[in-house]
Amino acid sequence: PSQVLYFLGAMMAGVVPVLLHEYLKEEDIAALLRERPIGGFLSDTCFDGLKMQPAGELWQMTGKETGADADFGVLTSGTSGLAKVLFRKEASWRDFFPVQNDIFHIDSHAVLYLSGSMAFTGNLNMLMAFLYAGGTIAGTEAVQPKTWMKDIGETQATHVYMIPSKLSALCRVRGKASSVTHILTGSQLMTKRILDALTRHFPMSRTILYYGASELSYVSYIEGKDILTHPSAVGRPFPGISIIIRDGEIYVDTPFAVDGAERPLTCHDMGRVDEEGMLYFLGRREDQYHIKGNHVSRQKVLSHLLMLPGVEEAEVIGEKQANGDDRLIAFLSGQVSASDARLMSLLAGRLRAWEIPHRILRVASIPKTSTGKTDRKRLLAMVKAVSLG
């Protein structure tokens, strides 16, 4: 709650607030300052190496001018994993709230439950959308699924907002909440196991998966069983949003983007739109592999891996070969009882021959970086360790 109070208080005082992740190290903040100057920090941590001057109990000033004609800033990790600040006008969110609240069925009777820091753009936006509608907000920063389930029941939450990996953890604990009518999620692909488990835990709910970015806000959404019947699809555009595909890249024309954004804008995600207007997210350009003269989308392969029985998490990486081709290695976690041969057979019914991974490795969990992204270096190390063994 204190994050939100300070954020709103700073805006009312005419300051341009930016919420930072608590896990950011001093060197990360130094890199952030080089990229986009920030005038001061409200923090209970002293950053000795950044040469800032105390300006009150919690304030530390950098002596720099932000130079942004904006109302607030949001963070994005970008392609490098390093935090970057993007600036927004209040209207870029406020004017879209009626649209997203209609799609997500948010009104003054809705009760939101969410988990994590408000420095995550999705959390902050969803919280502000509920405030705009006059709804009720509950949540915690604790990573404790048992606490989540208990809180959801006690608060009679109608909406749960979490990324799929958190929903997966939530569904592994006991409990049922019939008050929940909507599960809102994005940023990652869903699995059949998670969707089935959500139905058991929240029998009155429907799931809405969205695609968006800090730069763009919401772009498209897909609901319920369509998530299963259209692997790698991220739905149709929100009202007022246009999607254009240029050379395989997704371009979005939206009036609700960050300050200074071109129209249309691309985040360099790859995709396609089918004849029904459904957008398929195929990953980033650097996530395209080359196998026997064919381009293979990591996202497409990953979406089908996640639909295999018993899979909780999955990842796929390309191992470069001497001839320049990539060899796909799949990683699966969960209670996957089927043999590798059976899994390969299931994939053969859904993927082309060159899209099927060369090898499947079963792991306890998919390693993550501090920002929650897959740690591909550790996955490559696992491959080398298995090869040497």
Q: Where do the PLM segments sit?
A:
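AMP-binding/adenylate-forming catalytic domain of the ANL superfamily
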Residues: 351-374
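Gly/Ser/Thr-rich phosphate-binding loop
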Residues: 159, 171-229
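AMP-binding/adenylate-forming catalytic core of the ANL superfamily
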Residues: 268-355
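Conserved AMP-binding A3 loop
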Residues: 71-98
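Adenylate-forming AMP-binding core of the ANL superfamily, especially NRPS adenylation
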Residues: 189, 196, 209-210, 220-263
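Flexible, low-complexity linker/hinge segments
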Residues: 46-71, 95-97
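Conserved AMP-binding/adenylation subdomain of ANL enzymes
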Residues: 94-111, 118-159
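Conserved AMP-binding/adenylate-forming
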Residues: 1-23, 115-117, 295
